[in-house]
Amino acid sequence: MAPRAASPALSENEFDITGALFQNDSESDNERSSAKSKRQPKKKIPSQDLDFLGDVNDDDGDEAFIAQQQTSANRKASNLKGRTVKKGGGFQAMGLSANLLKAIARKGFSVPTPIQRKTIPVIMDDQDVVGMARTGSGKTAAFVIPMIEKLRSHSTKVGARGLILSPSRELALQTLKVVKELGKGTDLKCVLLVGGDSLEEQFTMMAGNPDIVIATPGRFLHLKVEMNLDLYSIRYVVFDEADRLFEMGFAAQLTEILHGLPPNRQTLLFSATLPKSLVEFARAGLQEPTLIRLDTESKISPDLQNAFFSIKSSEKEGALLYILHEVIKMPTGPTEMAQQRQGEDASARFSKANKRKRAEMEKAVNTKESPTQHSTIVFAATKHHVDYLYSLLHEAGFAVSYVYGALDQTARKIQVQNFRSGLSNILVVTDVAARGIDIPILANVINYDFPSQPKIFIHRVGRTARAGRKGWSYSLVRDADAPYLLDLQLFLGRRLVVGRENGDHVNFAEDVVAGGLPRDGLSQNCEWVTKVLGDDADIAAQRTVATKGEKLYMRTRNSASLESAKRAKQVVSSDHWTSIHPLFQDESSNLEAEREKMLARIGGYRPSETIFEVNTRRIGKQESEEALNTIKRVRTTLETKKKRSKANAKSEFLEDAPEGLKTGEGEAGKNEDEAAFSDADDIDAPTGVADDMSLASDSELEVTFSSYSQSNGNKSKKASAASFQNPDYFMSYTPNNNSLAEDRAYGVHSGTNSNFAQASRSATMDLAGDEGSRGFGEPRTMMRWDKRHKKYVARQNDEDGSKGTRLVRGESGAKIASSFRSGRFDAWKRGNRVGRMPRVGEAEAPNLAAGLNAALSGKRFKHRREQAPKRADPLRGDYEKMKKKADKAKERSMSKAGGAAAGGKSELRNTDDIRIARKLKQRRQEKNARPSRKR
């Protein structure tokens, strides 16, 4: 038998996939045709020239050779001609099709974002997902890429297979753009259903059997009820920015839509935050969802440094200006980017060369990779605070942008883009508006209004100190906010440093450091604010509105814990609370600290005698004896209360101790404190207990504390009786060890993210509305007072937008507006002569599909058919007008058909026309030659 070939045949893994990736590409074809002339001879693999005749029967050597060749082929990027192959870990490793990879490369995506890297593999495994991601983090591609991969191509069976619900028209348009760009290599049909567009055109689109529907909940529910749509064919559902969907009042629409979806669908829910109402919705509408949350969103960066400034309520505006001027060193006037744009020549701005320059500059300047040291976000409580702070900071000369929940989507996009591009250094926002904004170039965060929950604080400051960069957060803390500061300190598990009680040795990244601002600079800024409020009536009016909004915000925000409220009284009453913050460590701040101490001593001075006792020496004892007795009684009462409070404070740690450690009955003559401590010292330790408890083992500690608890004299008979349980055979229902977290981690079905309810408990966070309105799911009154009719009316009609109109019950039982069943779809079918609509699962009708293609192409149908006009009626008043119209129509038809009148009226005259023209000309000449009548 002849020996086989020296090198093994090429395996399928070594197949060149360039043609599959870039087929039907004009650019790649041109590159290949131009490269044919310059093609170099293919390099030989060195191992192919080796002699393998001696290793014919060596299978291990062949396997090693094949593995080596495959490894080298996968490692070298030169095998793909004309293209650059990305390293592993990108989109190529996710098992996507060639057309989709080509569309992703054309879109400019090279490396998936963190949310895409975590979400796409889970979605490809047909699991329901709850993803927490902000706008700008790539979440749109995170659910569009798997959707296109799953749907692949257009289905001739009737029924949409993908549904994406967005809260606004603008966001739906952005999603449609991404779907069209990523689905370029497929024949998937996508429609957009938003309010404001013609219902008849949307009827045509839905009748043409689209594959993907991108819609707002209100318009989609309208079409569902009007057209009686069957949603049983939908396999892929996405709720984009679900928190905004609930916030904008789409809860009833979402419930009705969710009721009509099939149970075997795959549901994805993306949101910037996870309120409690959204958790309940996810548990009801999703099947065993997986919570995907980035680690950077749930913890504070170790590179973040925090500073907390204790201020008074009347000093908040001045403190904000002082931080911007003195701490951050924020420049006033236009920013550098704004100056560059202003410096461009207006005449040459629209030239082609300058356009090319600006385009290249915008591509070169990547906003995500060019942070500035002055980019700052200021968090305020309500939208009224945002308006007020924007006007105040703009008056101070800063470049400011602002965003709040009720702002128009276009205006919101413009304001955020100005901040991202560097046209403004400060962005004033509310928690509700900022939850969906992803700004990776942030350097500073200022909490103008202190957050009411530690999770909200982490959500705010988590936007800075990313990717190894340093960042600062500055918080203004009033006396009323001190309990929330202590809650935050306990949540973070860090040391609380107030003022300079520990000297200058503090770590702003590991400690919660609080203190006051320098009085001189703060007073100057407060005086400037007072002057502006006196001069500008508009800003003063905005401050009045913000004050009223703050009262409502204080009433509706969460309350702090009771223990933190008790501790806050002691912290606020201490002298260190108002002392200079350790952040200011220069010589002037030291002098300011000494000045504050002197003022505190002067302010805390209390004379030894009251005015009544001083007057005794002047007037006499007889006249002031009654006043002196009153003062003595008050002073005695106060001294007794002080002693009692000290005794209670010292004996607090003995409340839970055994009675053997408390005061003995036979030592009543001693003081309470002395007796307690003497008894504690006289009690002998139990047998076998070591003096040094830090060196005791676990078993010794168990014996020690068990005998320690059994030494109590007031034991019950049940506890003192011998136990019937035999330790050799009895199995306890409670675990013997305390490492429950370790046992849960080893469980197959009890991992960190397997239980959505448990995983979402740490991620749940409710944000207060920035307009004072209650969020979805919060309790509210069902009735309201109608001033016009002088009676209580139902509030539900105001919430669903029907304003007292008639409501009907939907399929899910929820009330929907009766205007959804208006009969316009039946009129559209009669007008378009459409009979029975095909049902879900049937083959699509070709005429309806053609109508959809025409609607998607953007070209509207125009009536071009010409018919003979009706004969004019002599009895009508417009007979002459209609007759002329009919004559003109006949002339046009004759010109099109050809003949005597083809191409318009003939210019050639016959003999009759010439004779008539000569007569008219002769008459004119005779008339002009007549002599005048005056002669």
From Swiss-Prot:
It is an enzyme of class 3 (hydrolase). Residues 1-51, 638-674, 857-935 are annotated as: Disordered. Residues 360-514 form the Helicase C-terminal domain. It is found in: Nucleus, Nucleolus. ATP binds at residues 133-140. Residues 35-45 have a biased composition (Basic residues). Signal peptide: none annotated. It catalyses: ATP + H2O = ADP + phosphate + H(+). The Q motif is unique to and characteristic of the DEAD box family of RNA helicases and controls ATP binding and hydrolysis. This is ATP-dependent RNA helicase dbp10. It comes from Aspergillus clavatus (strain ATCC 1007 / CBS 513.65 / DSM 816 / NCTC 3887 / NRRL 1 / QM 1276 / 107). The gene is dbp10.
